[in-house]
Amino acid sequence: MSTATHPRPEGPVVETAAPMPPVAVCIVTGLSGAGKSTALKVFEDMGHFVVDGLPASLAPEMVDMMSRPSMSHFKGIALGMDLRQSNFLDEINEALSDLAAVNIRPMLLFMECDAQELIRRYATTRRPHPLEREGMGLEASLLSERNSLSPLREMADLVIDTSRFSIHDLRRAIQKRWSDSKSKLRAIRVNVISFGFKYGVPREADFVFDLRFLTNPYFVADLRPMCGKDKEVAQYVFEQPHAREFCVKLIDLLLFILPLMETEGRYRVTIAVGCTGGRHRSVAMAEEVTQALRQADYPVTLEHRHLELG
């Protein structure tokens, strides 16, 4: 039996790019005043692309845009939707069906809160409930919205009741649920800055450490033109009796306090290490601290602010 042969196509073989994985989508909805806007800000801080007040009918188009390679640096997309659209429930059901057809299954997050707490929040902010514009009082608006959204609440993948939540409690709840378990890096970002006191302390610093108790390499003629990134300067700094001990204790302090700050919902902390001119001692110490924090899986940025001035 003969075997048919097929000629190879002429011209270069073009390799097609691997398809991008489905984008992670979270639809945030719920009762007005229950924390939807705050939740969306948390998603934004966590690296999601956020759109608030999006008509449900536009969700498939928005998700399609986010599936492009140019948007791949975002961790996902969070869409805020509410009852201000008259046909909201019909549109969101249709949008979910359209997304399911392209293998995208959004997480539906519903923000809940008890009536008395909502009344207190509206009294504090003095903002009108969206349905009050239709001639209803606040309590009637809250009840109408709750009844209208009850089918959506039943559909939700996750309901967060913020009745007894502070803003920080809500932030922690969302961080815990949507943390990237595949990444080794901690959620809190650390900025390390070396600086010179004679040029001013960085205003954004959360912690400031003064290294002027160490002998200044500036007064060693061979070291003066160098900086703390040079091996000779770093060796001179850390051979001093208390320099290495200070460095170890500083790193221990940071490794103790950073997880606590992360638990409280902090996303970044700035550590400033200063000496007189910001060229020798502070630079050497900042380099050492940065290396230790990176080894502990913290995402760290390092800036030598006054290196060229010192």
Curated annotation (Swiss-Prot):
Disulphide connectivity of cysteines: none
Pfam family of the protein (one): RapZ-like_N
Residue positions binding GTP: 82-85
First and last residue of the signal peptide: none
Protein origin, superkingdom: Bacteria
Residue numbers binding ATP: 30-37
Keywords annotated in UniProt: ATP-binding, GTP-binding, Nucleotide-binding
UniProt xrefs under SUPFAM superfamilies: P-loop containing nucleoside triphosphate hydrolases (SSF52540)
GO molecular function: ATP binding; GTP binding
Keyword GTP-binding attached: yes
Family: Belongs to the RapZ-like family.
Task of the protein: Displays ATPase and GTPase activities.
The protein, known as: Nucleotide-binding protein Ddes_0972
Species: Desulfovibrio desulfuricans (strain ATCC 27774 / DSM 6949 / MB)
Source taxonomy: Bacteria, Pseudomonadati, Thermodesulfobacteriota, Desulfovibrionia, Desulfovibrionales
